[in-house]
Regions:
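Helix-start (N-cap) detector for alpha-helical repeat units in TPR-like alpha-solenoids
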Residues: 31-33, 66-67, 99-100, 133-134, ...
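Canonical tetratricopeptide repeat
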Residues: 37, 71, 104-107, 138, ...
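Terminal, low-structured helical/coil segments at or just beyond the last alpha-helical repeat
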Residues: 32, 270-274, 329-367
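Structural marker of alpha-solenoid helical repeat scaffolds
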Residues: 61, 94-95, 128, 162, ...
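Register position in tetratricopeptide repeats
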Residues: 44-45, 78-79, 111-112, 145-146, ...
Length: 367
């Protein structure tokens, strides 16, 4: 009888234990969900750091919640922490080995420049979702970034079989063709694009580059100018146009375009090396346009950012034009010091150019 009573007591205890466990799990789940909801609110308002903190707490409470792992991976991507995003997606993969998960992992590896890993996961994703154009495009990009342009073209062709109007794949394929100097093949694709009454500034850039290769500088400039009308702050287009103007000896127009370039570079926060080159090119354009004072100002800006023998040499000529022979002589010495292999040529230019005869006589004996 005692044993019988004890049995009932044990059963009652077990029921109570199970009830408490279920209640505890429910509480954890509710708390985890509340953190996930808080994270969603933070995410919507661009507070990604706070969203990550809330999702991390949710994961600690419910580590098998796939949605939370995925959300944190997406949030890490927003903060450009792609290495952490990959780790979270790999956790998701344990529970959700879908094409979407594999494709997301492949994309993050692509950004991290781990191209073999990117291809491995993207190829698996494509096997599961063969019509997903983004996976195929990213696979092609992985080859392009490694400069395997032929393989990239093959992959872009596969993407275009899925969607013949996927313009980013078409544009990237043309870039690869131009890298391989297959200008005739690229030209056919570009012309077909315009024949189909499609229009894009990027295609104008490609067509301009092809025309430049074929020596049609004025026609190329026309395409670049049309593209600039669409994208007036595109530095690449502006540089192409400026280079064409220089080739055509239209130096005043070139200088005007290069002024736009350096203004945009300052606005967009380009690297000091890139700005230095373009301040120098502006200075040289102004020199050719006989605007000595402005040329001096911009060449000096270039040298301040990143001293180079080339722009010291150009500034030598500008200072000589302005009759600052002492300053010009110092710049010539600096150019020769920075690039000894060209020292003789630098001196020879001033020796052989009649307009610098006075400067040469004043300075060359000291060099």
């Amino acid at each position: 009888m005692t044993l019988f009573v004890c049995g009932f007591a044990e059963i009652a205890f077990m029921k109570k234990f199970l009830l408490l466990a279920l209640l505890s799990f429910s509480a954890f789940a509710q708390t985890s969900e509340s953190y996930r909801l808080k994270a969603a609110a933070h995410f919507e308002n661009g507070r990604y750091k706070e969203a990550i903190a809330a999702l991390t707490l949710a994961i600690k409470l419910n580590p098998k919640d796939v949605k939370t792992w995925r959300n944190r991976a997406i949030t890490y991507e927003k903060t450009e922490k792609f290495d952490l995003a990959v780790k979270d997606y790999l956790e998701v993969l344990k529970y959700d080995p879908s094409g979407e998960t594999l494709g997301a992992i492949g994309f993050d590896y692509l950004v991290l420049e781990k191209y073999e890993e990117a291809r491995k996961h993207l190829q698996q994703a494509i096997t599961l979702l063969p019509t997903n154009i983004n996976f195929r495009y990213n696979l092609a990009l992985s080859h392009q970034y490694e400069k395997n342009y032929a393989l990239a073209i093959e992959a872009y062709d596969e993407a275009l079989k899925v969607d013949r109007y996927h313009t980013t794949s078409l544009f990237s394929k043309i870039r690869c063709l131009l890298r391989l100097e297959k200008f005739d093949v690229a030209s056919v694709l570009v012309d077909s694009f315009f024949v189909a009454k499609r229009f894009d500034a990027e295609m104008l850039l490609f067509r301009g580059d092809i025309k430049l290769h074929n020596g049609a500088t004025e026609a190329a400039l026309n395409d670049f100018t049309r593209a600039i009308a669409i994208n007036p702050e595109d530095i690449i287009l502006l540089i192409r146009a400026a280079d064409c103007l220089a080739e055509l000896s239209q130096f005043d127009e070139e200088a005007a375009v290069r002024k736009r370039i350096v203004t945009l570079m300052e606005k967009q926060g380009e690297t000091k090396e890139y700005r230095a080159i373009n301040y120098g090119l502006l200075g040289f354009a102004l020199y050719n346009a006989f605007q000595w004072e402005e040329a001096l100002e911009n060449l000096s800006a270039s040298i301040t950012l990143d001293p180079s023998a080339t722009f010291y040499f150009y500034r030598t000529a500008v200072k000589a034009k302005l009759k600052d022979y002492a300053g010009a002589c110092e710049d010539l010495k600096k150019a020769q010091e920075l690039n000894p292999s060209e020292a003789e040529n630098y001196e020879g230019y001033f020796a052989d150019t009649a307009e610098f005869e006075e400067f040469y006589e004043s300075c060359m004996g000291e060099v």
